[in-house]
Amino acid sequence: MTALEMQLTELLEASVNASGYELVGLEFIRAGEHSTLRVFVDHENGINVEDCAEASRQISAVMDVEDPITVAYHLEVSSPGLERPLFKAAHYQQFVGHEVNLVLKMAMNNRRKWKGDIVAVEGELITLKVDGNDETFALSNISKANLIPKF
């Protein structure tokens, strides 16, 4: 997570939570003049389009007042979806036993992309079962992580 993404998470989390939703995480994607702030929200009873619209209004109001992003951007608010992104250690703990794709910031054993089942979470260390072996990753070295849906 970048410094800006951490700042935005701190800025938005209380407001989103006060509205009855969980701020799962967010991504800020810089793409020249077409930057996007993608915010993932959830609710204990699931989330629908109306919930996303309500959360979007709440987030927009905070962003308009605080104005933490200096470039033009589009706001997208959505559910985490089937390929749910994992941002926090608690997310990994919630999905122990599930298969995930990881992309690392810095390669480990000459690999940046990993796929395996979450077997343990200890503090900021995430352990996956990869090809029969346990591999442990520091949360701070994980650039992106998504659940792999089972059909």
From Swiss-Prot:
Belongs to the RimP family. Required for maturation of 30S ribosomal subunits. It is found in: Cytoplasm. GO terms for biological process: ribosomal small subunit assembly; translation. This is Ribosome maturation factor RimP. InterPro entries: Ribosome_maturation_RimP (IPR003728), RimP_C (IPR028998), RimP_C_sf (IPR036847), RimP_N (IPR028989), RimP_N_sf (IPR035956). NCBIfam families: PRK00092.1-1. One of its GO terms (cellular component) is cytosol. Keywords: Cytoplasm, Ribosome biogenesis. It comes from the Bacteria.
